[in-house]
């Protein structure tokens, strides 16, 4: 057996998320089917760094798996890409130690969220951005995001469907910038881990701060109250990208 670490990108639009589900097209399912074809029927299980939801994209998802035989990394890259659909690209393949695990070896992740501005939805980027047609003070958002940096209890920002009890996470960076070319604002969050829907809830809250509907330091209040209902909104899946996983 040879142990591989593979980095890939995908357009999440036509996937029912990353994780295998019965009778659904998923990223994990497509990967495992391709690898099983390469082994001529011997099942290959793939571990991912995390589960992305339906409609969420990845610029740098990481998987790991054991493969029977010893294929050079570059050959694995080419072989996998030859079996990928148009909405998945294998970016890099590496042979790693057997104890490497895409999820459990990860030290941190970086997510990006794109928000399209303008009153009307652009039909050509609607599957790749969120959309916010209301006024925004980006400087207010910049101030607010500084309150996220550090170690906090993110109970208010975790979707009710999650099963993880410990909701304390550390955020190393939280930024927002304007892209005048695309008329978008782009959020980035880098932390040691993220709860279910956490980034999308943080973005929805930040947009309400930028719109003046919330106090500029409302993140601090939401940390204290530990109440998901008070954070309210969740930004659409379409604007979210898993940008990078750190090891």
Swiss-Prot record:
Catalytic reaction annotation: uridine(38/39/40) in tRNA = pseudouridine(38/39/40) in tRNA
Name listed for the protein in its UniProt record: tRNA pseudouridine synthase A
Quaternary assembly: Homodimer.
Primary enzyme class: isomerase
GO biological process, one term: tRNA pseudouridine synthesis
Chain sites annotated for binding substrate: 111
InterPro entries (UniProt xref): PsdUridine_synth_cat_dom_sf (IPR020103), PsdUridine_synth_TruA (IPR001406), PsdUridine_synth_TruA_a/b_dom (IPR020097), PsdUridine_synth_TruA_C (IPR020095), TruA/RsuA/RluB/E/F_N (IPR020094)
EC number per UniProt: 5.4.99.12
UniProt cross-references to Pfam families, sorted A to Z: PseudoU_synth_1 (PF01416)
Function field: Formation of pseudouridine at positions 38, 39 and 40 in the anticodon stem and loop of transfer RNAs.
């Amino acid at each position: 057996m040879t142990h591989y670490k593979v980095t890939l990108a995908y357009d999440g639009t036509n996937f029912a998320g990353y994780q295998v589900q019965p009778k659904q097209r998923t990223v994990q399912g497509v990967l495992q089917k391709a690898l099983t074809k390469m082994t001529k029927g011997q099942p290959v299980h793939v571990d991912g760094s995390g589960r992305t939801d339906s409609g969420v994209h990845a610029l740098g998802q990481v998987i790991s798996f054991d493969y029977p035989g010893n294929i050079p990394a570059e050959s694995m890259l080419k072989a996998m890409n030859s079996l990928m659909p148009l909405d998945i690209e294998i970016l890099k393949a590496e042979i790693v130690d057997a104890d490497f695990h895409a999820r459990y070896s990860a030290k941190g992740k970086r997510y990006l969220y794109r928000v399209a501005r303008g009153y009307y939805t652009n039909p050509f980027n609607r599957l790749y951005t969120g959309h916010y047609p209301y006024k925004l003070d980006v400087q207010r958002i910049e101030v607010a995001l500084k309150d996220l940096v550090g170690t906090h209890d993110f109970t208010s920002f975790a979707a009710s469907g999650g099963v993880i009890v410990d909701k304390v996470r550390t955020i190393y960076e939280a930024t927002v910038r304007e892209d005048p070319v695309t008329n978008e604002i782009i959020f980035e969050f880098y932390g040691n881990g993220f709860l279910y829907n956490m980034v999308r809830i943080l973005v929805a809250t930040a947009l309400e701060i930028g719109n003046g509907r919330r106090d500029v330091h409302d993140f601090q209040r939401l940390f204290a109250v530990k109440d998901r209902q008070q954070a309210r909104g969740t930004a659409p899946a379409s604007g979210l990208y898993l940008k990078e996983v750190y090891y």
